């Protein structure tokens, strides 16, 4: 799952992406590794930002905390909502450093502008 900052998860009491991932874990019978990625910075909320602002805001916000857990494995990265893809892109860039066999993305919702 896409991690939250410790402060955000503490104030919220849960990580919505991890809740979704745990549901997939039960249905798909595959393990969830919530400690593979770590969110480093407490950034501004991205809900009101455009794509360029989101891309700048999210740079260097994640680190790969457990390379061995993903080496040569097929990864399904779970997030609740994809708006511009900036967060998922930043996470994928980190995950690639662990040499996974593949990375796929799953979101509950995707924001689309018409």
How should each PLM-predicted stretch be described?
Residues 1-76, 86-114:
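Conserved PRPP/pyrophosphate-binding segment of the phosphoribosyltransferase/PRPP-pathway fold
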